[in-house]
From Swiss-Prot:
One of its GO terms (molecular function) is thymidine kinase activity. Homodimer. Its EC number is 2.7.1.21. Disulfide bonds: none annotated. Belongs to the herpesviridae thymidine kinase family. The gene is TK. ATP binds at G56, P57, H58, G59, V60, G61, K62, T63, R217. It is an enzyme of class 2 (transferase). This is Thymidine kinase. The lineage of its organism: Viruses, Duplodnaviria, Heunggongvirae, Peploviricota, Herviviricetes. Residues 1-45 are annotated as: Disordered.
């Protein structure tokens, strides 16, 4: 179902989009679902908050697009950018976490360490990667009320633009490391079990980019501790494709328990998400994240999934179902990506906040995060 596309919820974004004029028309999908469980709209007298999560594989252009966006909008009290917590990853939470991750995968690929040894390091490192997102989500959650939709919904008093959602470190990158052989499926599901409930108004922007161009962009950028790992690039691209398909599968009525028997344990190529697919056909379960977990390690002797792992897949379905999904085409200039993102905000869903002081507290929280852990 379309998420009330066309409402100008973010006037600052809307003004910038109008000023930028048309680009080549490559925008993204409208949201594929409007959260049905947000009947409690909150106090209509309280202001609204818009949260935009820019996510997807590393190197696709997320940070560049966000920087272009913030530059176009200029300094504002009502829009705050929440960057990746690089200082936490590299200094505060542990020393050189990214270097440790890439070196561990490299050593595994060269046969210098076993898969079990790599999994211990990767699981520990992924805890470090996920901590800032999980903590921030927890302190933000009490301020988020019900979704504010309809013609009476006021423009947001505050917009937060996040560089990644918690699912990046609690789902997508663990799953990619599993595909790379450096994390167990049990460890991936342990992270999934820790995914926080999805708050109303979660606007998730994923992206598509041809793989050759993606590899070229990744080779050109300089990030502390990063190696150019084309196998990992392929794995994380696949996981994000599966994520988009899974959200659409759930929102179009797919039920993983009913379809589980269709899985054979042999993974097929995953269709890329279509940026224009706003209300298409039901994806196959074979093309979703659920297919990754039809593996012997998770199955009882009779071939059924152990109940404990099935419960975790129920958690996965519960967390992904309410998300408002957008897909941005990054195969254009940074300005083109920025303008496409600006146009998308008209269809995004804000929420009421829960107290009169919430906007000020949220703004302070976001700025504290950026100042304390958002360095390079």
């Amino acid at each position: 179902m379309a998420s009330h596309a066309g409402q100008q919820h973010a006037p600052a974004f809307g003004q910038a989009a109008r000023a930028s004029g048309p680009t080549d028309g490559r925008a993204a999908s409208r949201p594929s679902h409007r959260q049905g469980a947000s009947g409690a709209r909150g106090d209509p007298e309280l202001p609204t908050l818009l949260r935009v999560y820019i996510d997807g594989p590393h190197g696709v252009g997320k940070t560049t697009t966000s920087a272009q966006l913030m530059e176009a909008l200029g300094p504002r009290d009502n829009i705050v950018y929440v960057p990746e917590p690089m200082t936490y990853w590299q200094v505060l939470g542990a020393s050189e976490t990214l270097t440790n991750i890439y070196n561990t995968q490299h050593r595994l690929d060269r046969g210098e360490i076993s898969a079990g040894e790599a999994a211990v390091v990767m699981t520990s490192a992924q805890i470090t990667m996920s901590t800032p997102y999980a903590a921030t989500d927890a302190v933000l959650a009490p301020h988020i009320g019900g979704e504010a939709v309809g013609p009476q919904a006021p423009p947001p008093a505050l917009t937060l633009v996040f560089d990644r959602h918690p699912i990046a470190s609690l789902l997508c990158y663990p799953a990619a490391r599993y595909l790379m052989g450096s994390m167990t499926p049990q460890a991936v599901l342990a992270f999934v079990a820790l995914m926080p409930p999805t708050a109303p108004g979660t606007n998730l922007v994923l992206g598509v980019l041809p793989e050759a161009e993606h590899a070229d962009r990744l080779a050109r950028r300089q990030r502390p501790g990063e190696r150019l790992d084309l196998a990992m690039l392929s794995a994380i691209r696949r996981v994000y494709d599966l994520l988009a398909n899974t959200v659409r599968y759930l929102q179009r009525g797919g039920r993983w328990r009913e379809d589980w028997g269709r899985l054979t344990g042999v993974a097929a190529a995953t269709p890329r998400p279509d940026p224009e697919d706003g209300a298409g056909s039901l994806p196959r379960i074979e093309d979703t994240l659920f297919a990754l977990f039809r593996v012997p390690e998770l199955l009882a002797p009779n071939g059924d999934l152990y109940h404990i792992f099935a419960w975790v897949l129920d958690v996965l379905a519960d967390r992904l179902l309410p998300m408002h999904l957008f897909v941005l085409d990054y195969d254009q200039s940074p300005v083109g990506c920025r303008d496409a993102l600006l146009r998308l905000t008209a269809g995004m869903i804000p929420t009421r906040v829960t107290t009169a002081g919430s906007i000020a507290e949220i703004r302070d929280l976001a700025r504290t995060f950026a100042r304390e852990v958002g360095g390079v």
